[in-house]
Curated annotation (Swiss-Prot):
This is Holliday junction branch migration complex subunit RuvB. One of its GO terms (cellular component) is Holliday junction resolvase complex. It comes from Leptospira borgpetersenii serovar Hardjo-bovis (strain L550). It holds the Pfam family RuvB_C. Its EC number is 3.6.4.-.
Length: 341
């Protein structure tokens, strides 16, 4: 009988964390980013000083949080993780900053959502390791400067264009993560399978990688679901044929598109003749938040050429029609002879 891998939420979190690389040498892909970051980290270690503040941008799931953890491990310092949406008051941010030890790292995810008044607290903290606090109210109020220990702020964002220029300019190191290629995705799947104790053939790992939207987080999720199918069938190793059957059952196509992706494209084609159409209209039809569509679904489909963003709105490309096997609709929407396709 195959060994069960049913996990409770805590075990699931631990397993997920165990798949993250912990050192720069273990990180696959993002060569230029890694090469530069290796230099910056080594220089900080040599000087025995805090690393310059780091801004990491890129689509979700590419390794921004993982890189913050790696930097912490490489420098041998404590890492404090938080997210901008949960920092609602100046006192919250001040408490975080004053708790930082020398050369420690504060990681703030979704930093583009930080309120402008909170940004202003960060400016002197990042530049001079000081925060200005107002004590008291009215005529008795007075400004007090509180010194901080040297620390490194690592900010992560999926939307770097929304970060104000004054905040962005205070990050001495700015890194951009890009989508991974198929070979890198395959290596990530093989590494994760070794950690999980899953025997997998190379072509199966490549197939999982190709359908993971060029995103390691998705690859790890899909690997675990493929493991489920493999174990239930009593297989000793994961083969490509099993992957293809499992992906068909899960509704994931050869580009990694799932049901929601197809809903979005179908909405554009059926209701708006392929576009242009606004994001708000799409969100209402498919019943999903605009931000989720933009960050999770649309960015990938734009990248692989299924959607074009135009000043008038989103447009489904010819490739999108082909992927959905709807070239007849393309011909009708664009007034072209279907026999040409």
């Amino acid at each position: 009988m195959a060994k069960s891998h049913t996990l409770n939420p805590e075990e699931e979190f631990e397993e997920e964390s165990g798949l993250r690389p912990s050192l720069l040498s273990e990180f696959i892909g993002q060569k230029e980013v890694l090469n530069n970051l290796t230099v910056y980290v080594q220089a900080a270690k040599n000087r025995k000083r805090a690393l310059d503040h780091v801004l990491i941008s890129g689509p979700p799931g590419l390794g921004k949080t993982t890189l913050a953890g790696i930097v912490s491990n490489e420098l041998g310092t404590r890492l404090t993780i938080t997210s901008a949406p949960v920092i609602t008051k100046g006192a919250d941010l001040a408490r975080l900053l004053t708790s930082m030890g020398e050369n420690e790292i504060l990681f703030i995810d979704e930093i583009h959502t930080l309120h402008k008044k909170l940004e202003e607290i960060l400016y002197p903290a990042m530049e001079n390791y000081m925060i200005d606090l107002v004590i008291g109210e009215g005529v008795t109020a007075q400004m007090v400067q509180i010194p901080l220990k040297p620390f490194t702020l690592v900010g992560a964002t999926t939307r770097s264009g929304l970060i104000s220029e004054p905040l962005k300019s205070r990050f001495g190191i700015q890194l951009r993560l890009d989508y991974y290629n198929d070979e890198e995705m395959k290596e990530i799947v093989l590494r994760s399978s070794r950690i999980l104790g899953v025997k997998i053939e190379d072509d199966a790992a490549l197939e999982i990688g190709k359908r993971s939207r060029k995103t390691p987080r998705i690859a790890n999720h899909l690997l675990k679901r493929i493991r489920d199918f493999s174990e239930v069938e009593g297989n000793l190793s994961v083969k490509k044929g099993l992957c293809l059957k499992a992906f068909e059952k899960m509704g994931i196509d050869d580009l990694g598109l799932d049901g929601m992706d197809r809903q979005i494209l179908g909405c554009m084609i059926d209701r708006y003749k392929g576009g242009p159409v606004g994001l708000k209209a799409i969100a209402v039809v498919v019943g999903e938040e605009e931000k989720t569509i933009e960050d999770t679904y649309e960015s990938f489909m734009v990248r692989i050429g299924l959607i074009n963003r135009t000043p008038a709105g989103r447009v489904a490309t010819e490739k999108a029609y082909r992927q959905l096997k709807r070239m007849q609709d393309f011909s009708e929407n664009h007034g072209q002879d279907p026999t040409l396709f």
